[in-house]
């Protein structure tokens, strides 16, 4: 429903809630097959279903992901405030943490971030009259039209409520799973853990950041990130691995079931559309 607010603001007619849900869950299911395949599929699905420009739909999808990126940034800041000691422990204890700390503080990274868009802009200007650059510019403008609806769409308040609601549910998945294992229950009752909210936040943020690494639904990077996070609270590697594997496996099963439902829904919708066109 959140994405639907953007789509309508971009001039795309209201989509049935079931169809919109199918596009989301189908995307998650396809991401289990190949990284980011689901994102491409859901844009193509909506563009074909509503007979609209694909680049406009892609722009709304980028806006949707930008909203999630803002939420992750806010969660990182919150984690640095309430769990700074555990983050410092990760950066000091593990080679990965030391490498990450060096990577983010190295001036080369920031020089690249500054120079990359300048180089792209210069190259685009030099070759501005070529058909390739003109086509790219046209597609980028359509994507910007889809993305920019975030700043002037109706229902902004509801969009924000949906965004916070989605991420609260994501967090609760991680937090409630603590109750399922004896070795994580003490994180809920332990002193200084705020009823498990601090460990839950650290594990959740580590897992969320790992999703930026291309993978099949997070398999691998997400598990490693969760194991690292749990180890900061004294959970052994074997127990932490069990937590991450069981958690990920149940999520994958739910997504696969949702994907199967989505496939049947699309198949039946197309059949009904063909029958309707034949009658006409």
Language-model regions, residue ranges each:
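Predominantly cytoplasmic-facing regulatory/coupling regions of multi-pass membrane proteins
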Residues: 1-25, 82-208, 250-280
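Short amphipathic alpha-helical coupling elements at transmembrane boundaries
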Residues: 8, 12, 44-48, 55, ...
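Membrane-interface alpha-helices at helix entry/exit sites of multi-pass transporters
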Residues: 17-19, 37-39, 52-65, 69, ...
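Hydrophobic transmembrane alpha-helical segments of multi-pass transport and channel proteins
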Residues: 69-70, 209-218, 236, 248-257
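Alpha-helical transmembrane segments and their lipid-water interface positions
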Residues: 3, 31-42, 68-79, 215, ...
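Extended non-transmembrane interhelical loops and adjacent amphipathic helices
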Residues: 3-11, 21-51
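Transmembrane alpha-helix interface/packing and boundary motifs in multi-pass membrane proteins
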Residues: 26-35, 202-223
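Re-entrant/interfacial helical elements at transmembrane boundaries that shape
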Residues: 37-48, 215-232
């Amino acid at each position: 429903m959140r994405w639907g607010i953007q789509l309508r603001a971009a001039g795309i007619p209201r989509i049935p809630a079931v169809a919109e849900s199918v596009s989301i869950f189908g995307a998650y299911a396809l991401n289990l097959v190949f990284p980011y395949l689901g994102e491409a599929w859901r844009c193509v699905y909506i563009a074909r279903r509503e007979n609209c420009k694909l680049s406009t739909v892609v722009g709304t999808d980028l806006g949707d992901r930008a909203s999630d990126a803002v939420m992750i940034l806010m969660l990182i800041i919150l984690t640095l405030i309430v769990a700074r000691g555990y983050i410092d422990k990760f950066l000091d204890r593990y080679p990965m943490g030391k490498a990450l700390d060096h990577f983010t503080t190295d001036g080369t990274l920031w020089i690249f971030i500054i120079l990359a868009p300048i180089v792209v802009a210069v190259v685009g200007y030099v070759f501005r009259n070529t058909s390739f650059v003109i086509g790219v510019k046209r597609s980028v403008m359509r994507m910007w039209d889809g993305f920019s609806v975030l700043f002037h769409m109706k229902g902004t308040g509801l969009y924000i409520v949906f965004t916070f609601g989605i991420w609260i549910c994501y967090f609760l998945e991680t937090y409630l799973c603590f109750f399922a294992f004896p070795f994580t229950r003490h994180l809920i009752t332990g002193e200084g853990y705020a009823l498990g909210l601090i460990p839950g936040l650290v594990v959740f943020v580590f897992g969320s950041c790992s999703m930026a690494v291309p993978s099949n639904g997070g398999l691998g990077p997400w598990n490693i990130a969760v194991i690292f996070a749990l180890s900061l609270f004294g959970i052994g590697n074997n127990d932490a691995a069990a937590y991450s594997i069981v958690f990920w496996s149940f999520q994958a099963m739910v997504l696969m079931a949702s994907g199967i439902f989505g496939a049947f829904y699309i198949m039946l919708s197309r059949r009904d559309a063909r029958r309707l066109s034949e009658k006409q």
